[in-house]
UniProtKB/Swiss-Prot annotation:
Keywords: Chloroplast, Plastid, Ribonucleoprotein, Ribosomal protein. Its main location: plastid. The gene is rpl28. This is Large ribosomal subunit protein bL28c. InterPro entries: Bacterial_rp_bL28, Ribosomal_bL28, Ribosomal_bL28/bL31-like_sf, Ribosomal_bL28_bact-type, Ribosomal_bL28_sf.
Amino acid sequence: MSRVCPLTLKKCNHAFRVTYSHKRNHRRQFVNLQKKRIFINNEWVVLKISTKAIKTLKSKTLKSKTFSNARLLHL
């Protein structure tokens, strides 16, 4: 399973690891994914979503425009 949030579609960010002598090496900054249990359609579903999506879910519902472009597979 790839490290992508299914609600916000966030992916990893490509950055540099910079040493004291300013040598730069490529590295990836991964999304902060957490397992979250959500009650949808009269059943509990466990999703691995980003912490940004968890904060948004606390303030809005899944029916919101925010998640209209999300790739929710079988919800």
